Amino acid sequence: MKCILFKWVLCLLLGFSSVSYSREFTIDFSTQQSYVSSLNSIRTEISTPLEHISQGTTSVSVINHTPPGSYFAVDIRGLDVYQARFDHLRLIIEQNNLYVAGFVNTATNTFYRFSDFTHISVPGVTTVSMTTDSSYTTLQRVAALERSGMQISRHSLVSSYLALMEFSGNTMTRDASRAVLRFVTVTAEALRFRQIQREFRQALSETAPVYTMTPGDVDLTLNWGRISNVLPEYRGEDGVRVGRISFNNISAILGTVAVILNCHHQGARSVRAVNEESQPECQITGDRPVIKINNTLWESNTAAAFLNRKSQFLYTTGK
């Protein structure tokens, strides 16, 4: 009887662990070096390098697949270089896709969860299920702020931290939405893209310049799923084309992209709207992801659009 009971409890625990799996990390904004080191530490723990997109110790990595509902927590530290304060903000990030599911005010032990993340459960906290979703479309509308041209500095992050500490209720406010947009950019998006990491980290220097998010940065974030579907096919071609994004060599890839989705994991969700244009996480299963033209790797949709425009031009000009 005891043996049967033990097996039942063990199965229950294993079943629970398959539903939710979590780890804790810290992103330290004290210095440029601590910031980059924090991001690299997280990447090492949650992803596996692609050997064919690697130079020295730098590589593009693929997120390790975990059970649905798995997440990791990121504690924000070092916003004030001189004092150990502003340390009650924790972001909850879904591991399989690096989407920010919500944030925890650790002073009140309250988890404010976005409406599109009801599948994420955090134990030991009071969960507030918000009516606001996490999409950039919604957050920009509520914030009355476009990401292209959005400025982020140490000072604005402190202000954003205070806005989230003051937040209560179940509907995002303008200030809270602006705060989330800034923190998502310098955490989740910086984990995905070295380009964003590199451009923002300068704002943590003693001269404290302001990082301004460029249209190119925004374009990267909106096409992460498409990039993730193409790069695993890369084998040293002369270039890669995904929409308006071009990589001319492996150095350009490594200087821009750090972590990609696990698009080819069997059973992984293949479609989920992630941006204003409702692009999927990864290309729908069964579609051919890439086409090679003149030793350049083209995302299939990009190639189709390009060839269509070219044929129309030839038709109208009679060439």
Swiss-Prot record:
GO CC annotation terms, alphabetical: extracellular region
Signal peptide: 1-22
Residue numbers spanned by region A1: 23-272
Site keyed Cleavage: positions: 272-273
Catalytic residues, chain numbering: 189
Broad EC category: hydrolase
EC number in record: 3.2.2.22
Family to which this protein belongs: Belongs to the ribosome-inactivating protein family.
Protein name in UniProt: Shiga-like toxin 2 subunit A
Organism from which the protein derives: Escherichia phage 933W (Bacteriophage 933W)
